[in-house]
């Protein structure tokens, strides 16, 4: 392999290191290890047919060429996407900072205080702007937030409504079309009927349980919904409102006129359009609905010494605990983008946000008055940033389109011939003059250029916001770049990311996110593209999307790909909806059961329920495999109604099951489909694939296998790949003329981060990707060999090897000493490591996945850490350490505790803080001691204003 290829930088183990590791494992070669790990009958016979790998320099030139094919016109299409200004201090110190983008979802509270605080800022900003008491820390986008709102309101129906079968949701006709489409996809399998029309004409019938409104609406008109909301509540109907978050700086917020749920996108709070995504959806509601709310919620708590801290609250609602009974299948959301939006509000504060909104509104008012003087009729009576014009008889929309394109401007063109425009943060006087000139030329009239646009408003007193927002001190302290930079740095020092050390989370694949893959995201031609521009303006994006889709087909062995799902859970849902659509097309729509192994990730049953299926659990045997007898029995018992099997491969137990082909055959013999969860695809690439094994559909986690970063809990991409017979049923998009099974607002989902995976595949090539897979398996087996004689490995494959991850036995330790897997996880923090995956898929264990990116020296340091912790456990077992006062149950040890004048433990400060030599050179200090989880759930405080009595 050439030394200037990415594979040499991405893969952490060199040839000499591998030989040392193979000797420890007990095999003669890497090929022998792979042959003994992966069943021979599923091994690919030929290398992946992918383009030759590019060097980093060659890829930089190639991606620049693609970017150059994108034409950056000034776009006023709106419809949920707006140009914005990302403050450089946020772009440089957050968006482009690996400390922020390589961190994991903040389950481990003590090593996540920085991003938890940043997400708390986001929640507070959302609550303030919407005037609601509770918000989560992001959803995937506005459209999926709308679908979640409808599902939540359906679950909140009164007992009488449920008995009466109330199943109708009213959606105002002036909602964004992509939002209606995604709601429709979600509603159909849940037997929710959608009724659309004008909100003023609605008759509140007994079968109605909820209403969804847009504010301002899709035309840009800001309606006064107060009377309607009162009527809805009188009729026992909930009201959800899709609100433009920036408009709420000027408009009366929905929380003040009775909304039950307020949702939308925070894209215009400093997040580029990225050809549709990613951006952080938001979701706010009433406090009494907190246990019904989808998504993650950050709340206050205290550590064991009483220090205030943050944590993820009310996790018992979520899929990883409640599984099929969860409030939602949401897992990965948009944490990095929510963090950026939160910092945007912190940086600008109340005055800055109001000034931005007022400037946008003033320019809109100026344009309405000026264009109306040219003979155009503007239809919106109350508006924030959007105008819709009826054209005079002498002017056609095509004339305006031609003139606009000649000036490199995109406007919105309605089906009836009207023309619209939405002003944004980047619009200045010069841009306003160009817009005015387009309409003047079309009308054949002169116009007067202006040098300044005065502040103005047309918002009525009834709709004008009177209440303050962003009043917490965090929104007023950091308005200089110096202070903002230091604040961001203070927060990132509190967190463990890949910039600190290996993150060995099983089933999460925390691999390198190479700088060469990340750089294109900061390119304006990729950042500033609206998803609904004419196709020729997005030629570079379209070529990249086509190339990436073809490469994913090759890697998975499938015939079709959809890049639309915004997360792995969204991919599961999309794949199951695709299966359902196919079954309905062949007269098998009655099939409504999905078989799921007991070891499956919680998103599997949650997604199946969301897609309208019921779940049947299949047992696993003592070796961690699917119990074949139970599988056959369950498949036979349910064969007439069986729609699919959902199975992860290699399994969540970390092994390649030898009967996987037979498993697929059993399911197909019942007339059902095989859904392969691609969470563990990092152990397949180049060696086997779902299509070759016999699956019909799989989703991929680009933020796992394909090098896109986790971002502290998103963004992710969960594309689905399908066999030939399922291709016609893949998600489409109504705005592109193919409305079916839409699962996200944008046609290509989070298109803005696709260059990462594209770069990974293009620079690794077939040989590099295959070597990455082999090395991931090598690294996992090396750790297993090093730790098997102490902790023990719960499951191994047929020949005694693990796949790319392993489950470490901790249950016996607990029985003998009272030291739990959680204590071990917390103690790892003192050594500078993030915890592995706790108690999944087996309670009382740790699941470890090292990935191919880690070097032998890092693996050895982790082994030394785990063995030192093992010795600490033995000290407790042998009575050398106090069972009630030892380094494990007291872990982690924050700096403030170690340097305190009060030290009452029976072990030394040095043992607590510097247990091995490497820690002295690279000490990570947790910011808080062990956090009180019960307190944080007992009293949920989801904003910066919260405090404990």
UniProtKB/Swiss-Prot annotation:
N6-(pyridoxal phosphate)lysine modified-residue sites: 704
An example GO BP is: glycine decarboxylation via glycine cleavage system
What Gene3D superfamilies does UniProt report for this protein, alphabetically?
A: Aspartate Aminotransferase, domain 1, Type I PLP-dependent aspartate aminotransferase-like (Major domain)
What Gene Ontology terms describe where this protein resides (cellular component)? cytosol; glycine cleavage complex
Q: Spell out the reaction equation it catalyses.
A: N(6)-[(R)-lipoyl]-L-lysyl-[glycine-cleavage complex H protein] + glycine + H(+) = N(6)-[(R)-S(8)-aminomethyldihydrolipoyl]-L-lysyl-[glycine-cleavage complex H protein] + CO2
User: In which domain of life is the source organism classified?
Assistant: Bacteria
**UniProt GO molecular function:** glycine binding; glycine dehydrogenase (decarboxylating) activity; pyridoxal phosphate binding
Keyword Zinc present in the record's keywords: the answer is no
Q: Which InterPro entries match?
A: GcvP, GDC-P_C, GDC-P_N, GDC_P, PyrdxlP-dep_Trfase, PyrdxlP-dep_Trfase_major, PyrdxlP-dep_Trfase_small
CDD domains for the chain: GDC-P
Keyword Oxidoreductase included in the entry's annotation: yes
Keywords, comma-separated and alphabetical: Oxidoreductase, Pyridoxal phosphate
Which cofactor does the UniProt annotation name? pyridoxal 5'-phosphate
HAMAP family from the UniProt entry: GcvP (MF_00711)
**Which family does the similarity line name?**
Belongs to the GcvP family.
Which NCBIfam families does the record cross-reference, listed alphabetically? gcvP
Q: How does it assemble?
A: The glycine cleavage system is composed of four proteins: P, T, L and H.
Q: What is the documented function of this protein?
A: The glycine cleavage system catalyzes the degradation of glycine. The P protein binds the alpha-amino group of glycine through its pyridoxal phosphate cofactor; CO(2) is released and the remaining methylamine moiety is then transferred to the lipoamide cofactor of the H protein.
Name of this protein: Glycine dehydrogenase (decarboxylating)
* Taxon lineage: Bacteria, Pseudomonadati, Bacteroidota, Bacteroidia, Bacteroidales
